[in-house]
Amino acid sequence: MRRRGVYVMLTLCGVLTTALIAFLVLFLTGGQGANASGAPTVRVELSHSQGEVLGNYGFTAWTNQMFMQFRGIPFAEPPTAELRFRPPVARSPWTGTLNALNFGQRCPVITNLDGQLSDAELEDCLNLSVYTKNLTASQPVMFYIYGGGYYNGSAEDHPPNYILEKDVVLVVPQYRVGALGWLSTYTEELPGNAPIADILMALEWVQLHINHFGGDPQKVTIFGQSAGAGVASSLLLSPQTGDSLFKRAIVQSGSIFASWAINKDPRAQSMRICVQLGCSRCDEEDQLVECLRNAKVLDVLRITTTESFSPIVGDLQGILPQQPSELVKSYRRQIPLLTGFTQHDGSFVLASYYDALAAKVSNVSSLTVRQFSQGIYDLNNDTSGLTGNTLNRLLFKREILNSHDHSAAVPSYFDLTSTIFMKSPVITLATRIHTLQPSTPVYLYSFEYEGKYTRFGYEFGNSHYPFNGGVHHSNDNIYLFATHTLEGQDMQMSKKMVEVWTSFAIDGIPSELSPLTSASGPYNQLNLEITKEEDLLETLTSAIDDPENGRLQREDMEF
Ligand SMILES: *[C@@H]1O[C@H](CO)[C@@H](O)[C@H](O)[C@H]1NC(C)=O
Ligand SMILES: *[C@@H]1O[C@H](CO)[C@@H](O)[C@H](O)[C@H]1NC(C)=O
Ligand SMILES: *[C@@H]1O[C@H](CO)[C@@H](O)[C@H](O)[C@H]1NC(C)=O
Ligand SMILES: *[C@@H]1O[C@H](CO)[C@@H](O)[C@H](O)[C@H]1NC(C)=O
Ligand SMILES: *[C@@H]1O[C@H](CO)[C@@H](O)[C@H](O)[C@H]1NC(C)=O
Ligand SMILES: *[C@@H]1O[C@H](CO)[C@@H](O)[C@H](O)[C@H]1NC(C)=O
């Protein structure tokens, strides 16, 4: 809630300042004017007679530069009715001026549904937002793919006021999330990976139209975080990604090599959901399709709150025709890559595992440390037990493993969850690509700054956990998108992050970072100062090796 409050504050400041400069703007360039209520607006004509869009103004966070914003430009037809689950269809041209003054509808999420809207309106979410300072320039384009566990996320959650301090154009497309995007039966009607196809279509839109917004279509950087990292790394490996769509990539916290990044049995999932919708004959393809396609948005969302969704291998569009571990073998792109994780990127998995366990076992501490960690390995489905055996040896002292001393094990739990779910998949992506294409730079980072704000417990609160969140998953984004009011060192950190990310987008070299020279390193620790460290596998033991790791345990609460 705090985040929304801050965002509203930013918007309000924008509106006030807007009034002050309205006069100035009116006389700047053609295409700019004012709407009926006197607020300044700007018109842009798209290519190929697609139509005209009307935008307005925002202001950067630190130097109050004015930028133009076009929020909610549709790039695809609403994926509703017979288009539901199907690859996106390009938006047909419109006549007159289309208002892009506010964000379009987010793709349906159970917690954010507007009950007044019809399903067709709710599903009309394939809009993108463009932020730019100069319509006639030719600036590098940063194309952000949001995270949200493949079931959440929106353009609105990513205010541009830090990134627009630099001379770049920011594009934030929306893509389908949850069942309405990811369900598949490997058939024409439910081909799979529709959300990745949404992103591909938005990238094509950028190629066609971004020059009208002052962006250079030859200089597009994709960046994605968490589930968005899964999508961004899929685009890197996919044979369906044309070579001109983007020239650099940033993959934050996760990759398509993670076990959570691929849905192994979407067909069974589709049938399960069909049955839960109360339909009959869910084992017959046409009945199944009819059921899923005609289901009310609210019903689909309501019965899928405990399902997880993600990309699939073998979709009919050929986006991921083989396992990522196979696809990477023929990787030939020359795309500079910046990838990494937060220092304690897995602590959110520890938290949700803890919640799930506490719901089943009345006293979590009655489990031994070994039993507790086994449950985490089980989430990863490694049937050989190799992961568990090796990580038990690496991360736990022998005497702790058979004890109930969970407090002492907290740093080990941090390293274990971070390694399995985030760090190892990122390191695999980075080192496989570096090894195959040594002449293309790969930069690896560990984000280690601990500031005032955290995303720990953002959704459900964090006061009930017997541990703290550390440098939590998504905390890096606090410094890239203007969701909080940052001061002092936090603002300095934000300036550093924006400098690194945008310098990479501008010339392919992230300011102050060192590229991999071998599969062992070096890597870069991102903090108020950036430091180069030689051995990247040291990141896997970063919590247990930390002399100050006592702060990860809660002082006021027994585990
Ligand atoms: C005029 O622009 C303001 C801000 O740009 C917007 O909030 C308002 O809805 C617009 N009014 C009309 C009539 O389009
Ligand atoms: C997507 O954006 C377009 C243009 O602003 C708008 O017409 C459309 O209604 C938006 N979709 C929703 C559901 O808001
Ligand atoms: C989705 O994200 C929004 C905005 O961050 C949040 O308000 C909402 O609670 C989230 N929904 C779920 C189901 O996590
Ligand atoms: C916008 O970009 C053009 C082309 O680079 C340049 O000539 C112009 O001065 C820029 N305008 C502003 C306000 O910076
Ligand atoms: C929970 O289990 C631990 C370890 O067996 C034990 O020390 C503790 O007293 C138990 N707590 C409760 C409330 O039963
Ligand atoms: C892990 O395996 C179990 C049992 O085979 C299965 O039900 C579950 O879906 C699997 N989870 C993942 C993430 O593959």
Predicted regions and their residues:
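Non-catalytic accessory segments of hydrolases
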Residues: 2-196, 217, 490-497, 505-514, ...
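Alpha/beta-hydrolase-fold serine-hydrolase catalytic core, especially in secreted/extracellular enzymes
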Residues: 2-6, 436-440, 450-451, 487-559
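Alpha/beta-hydrolase fold nucleophile elbow
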Residues: 140, 213-226
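Alpha/beta-hydrolase-fold catalytic nucleophile elbow
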Residues: 174, 223, 238, 250-253, ...
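Alpha/beta-hydrolase active-site loop
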Residues: 191-212, 268-274
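Short glycine-enriched nucleophile-adjacent loop
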Residues: 229-241
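A conserved short beta-strand
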Residues: 243-255
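Substrate-gating cap/lid region and adjacent catalytic-acid/histidine neighborhood
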Residues: 298-491, 500, 507
